[in-house]
Curated annotation (Swiss-Prot):
GO terms for molecular function: ATP binding; D-alanine-D-alanine ligase activity; metal ion binding. It catalyses: 2 D-alanine + ATP = D-alanyl-D-alanine + ADP + phosphate + H(+). GO terms for cellular component: cytoplasm. This is D-alanine--D-alanine ligase. It comes from Petrotoga mobilis (strain DSM 10674 / SJ95). Mg(2+) 1 binds at D245, E257. SUPFAM superfamilies: Glutathione synthetase ATP-binding domain-like, PreATP-grasp domain. Gene3D superfamilies: 3.40.50.20, ATP-grasp fold, A domain, ATP-grasp fold, B domain. It comes from the Bacteria. Mg(2+) 2 binds at E257, N259. It is an enzyme of class 6 (ligase). Disulfide bonds: none annotated. Pathway: Cell wall biogenesis; peptidoglycan biosynthesis. Binds 2 magnesium or manganese ions per subunit.
Length: 298
């Protein structure tokens, strides 16, 4: 079976997407299938993709996670990995996500702006783009000068920016994979960056972050995480895999965002969580391919 891997695109996460695609390509080949790389920006992409009935989506950021690529594939009648357009839209737009869930799960207080406003929170606080990933454009703001500089910088690049309460605690990531129509919670990862926070450089530079599996998390924390996971899965329709980024403080779990097309690089969170559960990268990819086979058979 030929399996096209859709990668690249024009987003600011293009390079991460290409790295994910390389890893998935090698794994699909190891599993005995025939992988094909298709770059979303190729002129003949639409003609090429119509030769297949299934596609592996590793386009991070714009197009891949904002619902546009899944919408195109559905129009073409092509099954694909990861979540449907509606779920992608509701999670990639961080303010829509906040608005949907702020009354049901713990989240940092957040406001949206498209201009320079008075700081709504005491320093430090966070600013981040309304729509972006891999911590692009995310800054911890400590004073007025930083606020003006980084807010103006983000507004020029992203048009709309979230100003968010800073919750100082332990950064964790919560990964789920789908197997036999059921989502499995993988071991929680504690993220320990050597920088002030888990920014783009810390995520994708070897040695700048320790990803520490929490194999014996307190039952109280696991229960809260399961409640969060169950609530978002009852509200939105996920497929194959997804990841929740959160802050753990005083036994409370504060949800930051959800990633519907998790990174699959050697340094990415979800494969690290899977490995801590005894699931190799090849096994992870095979589970996802088997999900497709089950969907088609069903």
């Amino acid at each position: 079976m030929y399996i096209p891997i859709i990668t690249g695109g024009k987003s600011k996460e293009r390079e991460i997407s290409l790295t994910s695609a390389k890893n998935v390509f090698n794994s699909i080949s190891n599993l005995g299938y025939k992988p094909v790389i298709l770059d979303l920006i190729d002129d003949d992409f639409i003609n090429k993709i119509q030769n297949y009935k299934f596609a592996f989506n590793v386009v991070h950021g714009d197009y891949g996670e904002d619902g546009r690529l899944p919408s195109l594939l559905e129009i073409l009648g092509i099954d694909y990995t990861c979540s449907n357009p509606e779920t992608c839209i509701a999670t990639y737009d961080k303010f829509i996500f906040y608005s949907l869930f702020k009354n049901y799960i713990q989240m940092p207080q957040t406001t949206l702006t498209n201009k320079l406003i008075l700081p709504p929170f005491e320093y430090p606080f966070i600013i981040k783009p309304r729509k972006s990933g891999s911590s692009k454009g995310v800054y911890i703001i400590h004073n007025e000068n930083e606020y003006k500089f980084y807010l103006e910088k983000d507004l020029k690049e992203f048009q709309e920016v979230l100003v968010q309460e800073y919750i100082k605690g332990r950064e964790i990531t919560i990964s789920y994979i789908q197997k036999n129509e059921e989502f499995i919670l993988l071991p929680i990862l504690e993220i320990i960056p050597k920088k002030e926070f888990y920014d783009y450089e810390a995520k994708y530079t070897n040695g700048l972050t320790e990803l520490k599996p929490q194999l014996n998390s307190p039952e109280k924390i696991i229960q809260k995480i399961n409640e969060i996971g169950n609530h978002v899965m009852q509200t939105l329709t996920f497929k194959d895999m997804f990841r929740i980024d959160a802050i753990l403080k005083d036994d409370e779990v504060y949800v930051l965002e959800i990633n519907t097309v998790p990174g699959l690089t050697e340094l990415s969170d979800l494969p690290t969580s899977a490995l801590a559960a005894g699931i190799s990268f090849d096994e992870l990819i095979n589970i996802i391919i088997k999900n497709h086979v089950a969907r088609v058979a069903g």
